[in-house]
Design a protein with these regions (language model features):
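Helix-loop-helix junctions within the multi-pass membrane cores of secondary transporters/permeases
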Residues: 99-101, 113, 122, 256-322
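Membrane-cytosol interface segments
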Residues: 34-93
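Short juxtamembrane and helix-loop transition motifs at transmembrane-helix boundaries
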Residues: 101-113, 127-140, 157-165, 264
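Hydrophobic alpha-helical transmembrane segments of multipass membrane transporters and ion channels
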Residues: 150, 170, 202-207, 240, ...
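Transmembrane alpha-helical segments that form the functional core of multipass membrane systems
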Residues: 129-130, 138-229, 233-246, 250
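Hydrophobic alpha-helical transmembrane segments of membrane transport and translocation systems
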Residues: 283, 287-290, 299-366
Length: 366
């Protein structure tokens, strides 16, 4: 049995290595012209005074690269690239980089679009899948399936939005699909799955109702500073959908943990009273509540670090950034934190009620 498991792990490791090597050598399958940089020479062209006494240096690179695909494969081409020392909006290229060129395979251009990155993605994604299956076995496989299905659902949702469908209706549907797909794939058809799905949707409804009520009482947010929305005319709907989908994962984590714990308590002690069961589930929820809220805070803070650095480097004060540039992130964090807190009593009550129903009256497993 152990030898069989080791053979499977070796097979998975071999598949992983082949997958990574393939993505590093798949130039022939690209429709975009690719080239590998053979040599780079550069010179400084000018420098400008920046904020806080710093200097920004400008460089020009003369790059010789060898074309990797198309009818011009093997030919050398010379391209130029300009970049700044901060590399905020430009990039410095190095010898050995594989880059995507402008134009087509039949007529490659002399401008670099970007670096070919599928090798890095294959290394990381393949490593994740390999570790999931090797460490957690069948559960890891189901996790991968749920990731793939959720990605497909997300892609269909975006496609529907591009086709002109209402984004709120789309998000309502995909929120339900995300919950069902994730929980059924990971937990199967169990009581704890039904209680987790029901708890997640109830909490999601409560926090969105609270958000709508606060807007109704105190007025809508000012969306003029949402720079990433550009010229879209439905900023409020997009922000509403953003809150719904962002909070879904954290809420689902709490409801699954509590439902699984309550189910295990009932399985070990079927005669436990409903009051005692609710008390135990509540204590479990309190243990994970602080951790989950802090996880949300860390995710929020880490995502804002580049923006904070750039704006403060341009003499925009910390208080100004907080007042005018991140109120939406703060609002999102507060609503999702409220969702985590609400998920505890809601999931405890629903899970306790469902788990205490006699199993002979239901056609699903404990």
């Amino acid at each position: 049995m152990k030898s069989c498991i080791f053979h499977k792990k070796y097979l998975l490791a071999g598949i992983y290595i082949i997958f990574v090597l393939f993505t590093c050598c798949n130039s022939r399958f690209y429709h975009t012209p690719l080239a590998k940089i053979c040599s780079v020479t550069e010179k400084q062209t000018l420098s400008r005074e920046g904020t806080r006494g710093s200097k920004e240096y400008y460089y020009t690179q003369n790059i010789t690269a060898r074309i990797l695909n198309g009818p011009h494969k093997g030919e050398k081409i010379t391209v130029s690239n300009e970049y700044t020392s901060s590399q905020v909006q430009t990039k410095k290229y190095h010898k050995g980089d594989t880059v995507l060129l402008s134009g087509s395979k039949e007529s490659p251009g002399k401008t670099i679009r970007s670096v070919k990155r599928d090798g890095y993605l294959a290394l990381l994604a393949g490593g994740l899948f390999f570790l999931l299956i090797c460490i957690t076995g069948k559960q890891g496989f189901y996790t991968i399936i749920s990731l793939i299905l959720n990605t497909v659902i997300f892609a269909y949702g975006f496609q529907a939005f591009i086709e002109g469908k209402n984004i709120l209706n789309i998000c309502n549907v995909i929120a339900v699909l995300f919950s069902l797909t994730t929980l059924i794939c990971l937990n199967g058809i169990h009581r704890k799955t039904f209680s987790s799905v029901l708890s997640t949707l109830c909490v999601l409804f409560l926090i969105m109702a609270l958000f709508e009520f606060s807007i109704y009482m105190y007025g809508d947010l000012d969306y003029s500073n949402l720079e990433y929305l550009g010229s879209t005319g439905n900023s409020a709907d997009i922000f509403w959908a953003d809150i719904m989908l962002t909070g879904l994962g954290a809420i689902m984590d709490v409801t699954v943990t509590i439902s699984a714990a309550v189910g295990e308590i009932v399985r070990k002690n079927p005669s436990v009273s409903l009051r005692r069961l609710i008390h135990s589930g509540r204590e479990i929820g309190y243990d994970i509540m602080g951790t989950m809220i802090n996880v949300l805070l860390f995710v929020l803070a880490s995502g804002m670090i580049p923006m904070f650095i750039l704006k403060m480097n341009n003499d925009i004060s910390f208080i100004t950034i907080v007042r005018y540039h991140i109120p939406y992130d703060i609002c999102r964090f507060l609503i999702e934190s409220i969702g985590i807190v609400l998920a505890i009593p809601v999931s405890v009550f629903i899970a306790s009620a469902i788990m205490k129903i006699p199993s002979r009256k239901r056609g699903v497993r404990e």
